[in-house]
A protein has these predicted regions:
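Short, surface-exposed "cap/lid" segments of acyl-processing enzymes
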Residues: 44, 56-113
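N-terminal cap/lid segment of alpha/beta-hydrolase-fold proteins
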Residues: 25-57
Length: 271
């Protein structure tokens, strides 16, 4: 029961919008590590506007790598180990690093149709099928066009691996044409046998919300957001242990608990 409560709390936090401070923080974070962030917008064939991040190496080796985040997540997840984060390691090795944000996460929440707002049912009527059919080809092709690379290396994490497997099955010709190497981190092909009970419960809650016309779940007021952010900032260890406990994770000692408020705020739910 405690695990479910904490998980619901984290899900609630994951629906927050970006404040001005957060919009500048993640850019300042990367620049402080020596790599200014370039944000690119790409339009999918069905009208979604996606954000693709680009970091340029100081000594290029001519190779291009694309990183794709997991479920309820964003490209920001790849930076949670600070200077030892995967993008920074790749940059120091000379790789041209690109990171995609799929539809529905906090960086890719716009649509070409101004009437199709995020709170409207139509915006959220998507699944991994649309990510495979529209998002990945659009983002990968943009990277290829901007870099001139015929093929790039794809690194996926969690759902980022799932949608790549689906891409290979759905459009093998494109995968063969665009990808030269594939790296799978935290591989997931389904969650049918998950040992995390809240997933099934939350799925049922989502169905109920959709039936009654609620399309943006568990948003917080500014007062609630400020309270939680202040608590996590002053007690990062407690927040970190709560996450470890809720997800049954054995603490590794590598996570920067001081960054937890930002990582939680920059996450989003998946479909």
């Amino acid at each position: 029961m405690r695990s479910l409560f904490i998980s619901l709390l984290l899900l609630q936090l994951s629906t927050l919008s970006l404040s001005a401070d957060l919009q500048t923080y993640y850019k300042d974070f990367m620049e402080a590590h020596g790599y200014p962030l370039e944000e690119n917008l790409v339009l999918t064939d069905d009208g979604y506007i996606l954000s693709v991040w680009h970091l340029t190496p100081k000594e290029p080796n001519g190779r291009v790598v694309y990183l794709q985040h997991g479920c309820t997540d964003t490209a920001w997840t790849f930076f949670q180990l600070g200077d030892n984060s995967l993008p920074f390691i790749l940059l120091r090795e000379g790789y041209d690093v690109w990171l995609g944000n799929v539809r529905g996460n906090i960086f890719s929440h716009n649509h070409i149709n101004p009437e199709l707002a995020e709170v409207h049912s139509g915006f959220n009527e998507h699944s991994m099928d649309e990510m495979v059919e529209y998002d990945l080809p659009a983002m990968i092709n943009m990277v290829r066009e901007k870099t001139g690379a015929k093929k790039i290396t794809y690194i996926g994490h969690s759902q980022g691996t799932t949608i790549f497997f689906m891409l290979v099955m759905h459009n093998p010709a494109f995968a063969e044409e665009a990808i030269d190497h594939y790296v799978s981190l935290g591989t997931v092909n389904n969650i049918a046998n998950t040992l995390f009970p809240p997933i099934e419960i939350l799925d049922r809650i989502a169905v109920i919300f959709q039936k009654v016309g609620i399309f943006k779940y568990m948003s917080l007021t500014n007062a609630q957001r400020n309270l939680v952010a202040k608590f996590c900032k002053t007690s990062p260890g407690v927040c970190g242990k709560a996450i470890d406990y809720a997800l049954s994770i054995k603490p590794s000692g590598r996570m920067d608990y001081k960054s937890l408020p930002l990582f939680i705020l920059l996450s989003r739910r998946c479909k």
